[in-house]
């Protein structure tokens, strides 16, 4: 839930107007909107490159994943792995745009560890893949933009670790 929604829900629950502090936080959120949209657009426009680079780095660091018997062995399974990386990259953009981790939690993190465990997928390899996504994506961003996006990647990595 965005800071705007949270503030309104809290104020309404207490049957009051938004406080000066809440209004200031909303103002800060709105002012940062252009930056958040720019970050998400940069990532979205470069997603194929980011995912490919992250996948290549992951497979170099974790050759067991693409070796016979590995979860990404073979063309179809490698494509599935890259699809999953793209999914996490997309979730990060949702977090960036909303300025909140809620979309990441609600859409893609709840139950993910159990799912990967049931599939026999090494969760640490998935987390490493997201680390590589972070590296590739933040290299395209500068300063505060990289820090902003990096925080959402870190949240996903933490949830997977």
From Swiss-Prot:
InterPro entries: Globin-like_sf, Phycobilisome_asu/bsu, Phycobilisome_asu/bsu_sf. It is a peripheral membrane protein. (2R,3E)-phycocyanobilin binds at residue 81. Pfam families: Phycobilisome (PF00502). The keyword Repeat does not apply. The modification N4-methylasparagine is found at residue 71. One of its GO terms (biological process) is photosynthesis. It comes from the Bacteria. CDD domains: APC_alpha. Keywords: Antenna complex, Bile pigment, Chromophore, Electron transport, Membrane, Methylation, Photosynthesis, Phycobilisome, Thylakoid, Transport. Its main location: membrane. GO terms for cellular component: phycobilisome; plasma membrane-derived thylakoid membrane. It is found in: Cellular thylakoid membrane. The keyword Transmembrane helix does not apply. Contains one covalently linked phycocyanobilin chromophore. Gene3D superfamilies: Phycocyanins (1.10.490.20). Belongs to the phycobiliprotein family. PANTHER family: ALLOPHYCOCYANIN ALPHA CHAIN, PHYCOBILISOME 32.1 KDA LINKER POLYPEPTIDE, PHYCOCYANIN-ASSOCIATED, ROD 2-RELATED. Light-harvesting photosynthetic bile pigment-protein from the phycobiliprotein complex. Allophycocyanin has a maximum absorption at approximately 650 nanometers. Heterodimer of an alpha and a beta chain. This is Allophycocyanin alpha chain. It comes from Synechococcus sp. (strain ATCC 27144 / PCC 6301 / SAUG 1402/1) (Anacystis nidulans). The gene is apcA.
